[in-house]
Amino acid sequence: MDALQKAREYLERDPLLYMDMLGPLDRGMVEVVSLREDGVLLYNGPGEAFMLAADSLEAGKALCAGVEAMEIATAHDGETGAFLRDRYHLPDLRGCTQAAYLEKEPLPVPPGFEIRPLGEEFFSLILVNYHSFTDPEYIHKRIAAGVMHGAFQKGELL
């Protein structure tokens, strides 16, 4: 069994908690940095983010042992999050809540509304409103990747 399959098995123990890692894994966007029975550290290349899932702080530290630097990281509990923040000097690392829509059919969009990717013409607006990351180069990359979306009504971004 290869490392990606072993990582998947670990993450599928709690698929809702690790939805942010399983999605990129399914899309072939991650590589396994380190893997143990008690956790996994992935690197999401397009997102330029390390993604840590660990059963304990000790496991998290061991999984990160070979990583010299991180600029963007996610963790799934406060203790390993605090470790990443302190070890890699990530002052913007903070808690978040995830939600997942698990149905196969997309939610209906009311008449007159549209969800669509945002292009470079929306860069300034994204930079002002996207508080998680304020690095302009990162935002340009995410726009180019087609992963920034907006809700429009009558052609106007809401």
Residue ranges: model-predicted function:
Residues 1-68, 78-81, 132:
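N-terminal charged segments
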Residues 1-19, 95-137:
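Short amphipathic alpha-helix that is part of the acyltransferase structural core
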Residues 23-27, 140-145:
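Short loop/turn motifs at secondary-structure junctions and domain boundaries
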Residues 37-38, 156-158:
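Glycine-rich acetyl-CoA-binding "A-motif" of GNAT/NAT acetyltransferases
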Residues 61-110, 114:
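Hydrophobic alpha-helical segments and helix pairs
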